């Protein structure tokens, strides 16, 4: 009886500690991209993150949300998007509160988006650790992904640094960014030596053969203090005005202020605006079956091939002497490919 009571209490304490730990962890899903490179399936008015690309019953955005909802408290998940996609986000994620959907009035890439989200989360929880995630990635091993995310958040919680997640290249892919590993810092975490964005195929082959380069997944982590200091230093026009104009903004005031001032913010990615200009940047070696749905070529390379080395995505087709194609048809359509 006493042993059972002890085990019960031990389990309860562990659950409470785990809950307390993850309460400081936040995710911001970046869902404002136009998805032009996957035309005609993805179009500016309805880009790829809002499409059920593989016939799974969920769009890429919904899959991303559910992936993080298994790791973090749902109330700690935010979505950043463009005002043109606000209704799509609300339709596809009705469980997300309005004040957790941050809609920009104009496209300004990911750095201003992340700075704004950092400002909002900092006012909610000044001890938060944050992961920024694209909304259009494929993850084959969700258990490994969960483990890597938790380990990454624990690392940045304890260290004032920026952390990106890297995966080992499986092919010389010119459409991805590459991270060169430097000195080892802890377990699978290394200092970043350099970033290279979309090299040509010859250099991508050299990178892969060297073993020193990993693909950049676009997953970025840091504690809120480190993110805030980095954005304040490198993108001062974004955060400084938000805090100095009126640090006690309500959500509505903040949204109105951003609507008025966002067009003046620089058009810059997190990679170029923050990571490549910072000294304290690290990369974690990860292996969770990652693929980026950026281009038709990257999809072809990542997907399993069928007859004639064709990739057929949720489509009804008849193939006749066809090789090396990516085929995705609108629902209800049939095609003969020759």
Please report, for each region that a protein language model flagged, where it lies by residue:
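Conserved N-terminal catalytic core of the sugar/cofactor nucleotidyltransferase
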Residues: 9, 15-29, 37-44, 55-134, ...
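Short beta-strand segments
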Residues: 29-31, 80, 131-134, 164-168, ...
């Amino acid at each position: 009886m006493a042993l059972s009571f002890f085990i019960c209490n031990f389990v309860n304490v562990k659950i409470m500690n785990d809950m307390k730990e993850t309460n400081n962890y936040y995710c911001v899903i970046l869902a404002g991209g136009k998805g032009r490179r996957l035309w005609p399936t993805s179009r500016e008015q309805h880009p790829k993150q809002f499409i059920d690309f593989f016939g799974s019953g969920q769009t890429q955005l919904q899959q991303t949300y559910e992936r993080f909802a298994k790791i973090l408290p749902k109330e700690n998940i935010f979505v950043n998007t463009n005002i043109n996609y606000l209704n799509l986000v609300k339709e596809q994620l009705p469980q997300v509160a309005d004040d957790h959907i941050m809609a920009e009035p104009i496209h300004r890439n990911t750095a201003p988006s992340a700075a704004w989200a950092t400002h909002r989360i900092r006012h909610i929880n000044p001890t938060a650790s944050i992961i920024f995630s694209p909304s259009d990635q494929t993850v084959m091993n969700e258990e490994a992904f969960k483990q890597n995310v938790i380990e990454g958040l624990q690392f940045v919680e304890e260290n004032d640094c920026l952390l990106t997640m890297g995966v080992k290249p499986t092919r010389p892919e010119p459409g991805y960014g590459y991270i060169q590993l430097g000195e080892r810092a802890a377990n699978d975490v290394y200092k970043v030596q350099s970033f290279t964005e979309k090299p040509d195929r010859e250099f991508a082959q050299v990178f892969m053969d060297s073993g020193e380069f990993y693909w950049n997944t676009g997953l970025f982590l840091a504690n809120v203090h480190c993110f805030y200091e980095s954005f304040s230093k490198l993108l001062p026009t974004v955060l400084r005005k938000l805090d100095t104009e009126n640090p006690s903004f309500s959500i509505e005031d903040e949204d109105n202020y951003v609507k008025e001032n966002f067009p003046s913010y620089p058009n810059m990615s997190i990679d170029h605006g923050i990571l490549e200009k910072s000294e304290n940047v690290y990369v974690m070696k990860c292996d969770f079956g990652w693929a980026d749905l950026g281009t038709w070529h990257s999809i072809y390379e990542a997907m399993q091939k069928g007859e004639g080395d064709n990739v057929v995505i949720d489509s009804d087709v008849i193939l006749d002497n066809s090789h090396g194609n990516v085929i995705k048809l609108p629902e209800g359509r049939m095609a003969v490919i020759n």
